[in-house]
């Protein structure tokens, strides 16, 4: 099974991003636009994991999160846009990005630097999403609080879908004043 750890932004925030994509979809309708119900903010990608290892992965994520709880809420917003190597069009993340990186680092097994983003479209064979990225470059969405971290299973195929396997609160106790 394919597993990843992610945040699920609130529905109203995703609706705002979706509305902002309208002009980008008009200038580049040929991109493979990802449906809103599959949008998430990936923290760590574990890839293929044997079914019998699921309990161990759940325990590992829980242990890692408990070792590095973030005090107080993590406030984020989506802002700007870009593309990754002609593979994906993304909307950027603003706000408590350093804390988001710390959260990602706590569950990540990959050594590459974490680049927070919301993938909104995939590109086919060398496509360039520059026009769509330019349209979205000035986007600044509403602020939202990350409340839960989710371990998610992805099912590939003609109709990909996601299933939340387990969830944990993002934060530890709020700091005392």
For the regions a language model picked out, list residue spans one by one.
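Histidine-dependent nucleotide/RNA phosphoesterase domain, centered on the 2H-phosphoesterase fold
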Residues: 1-177
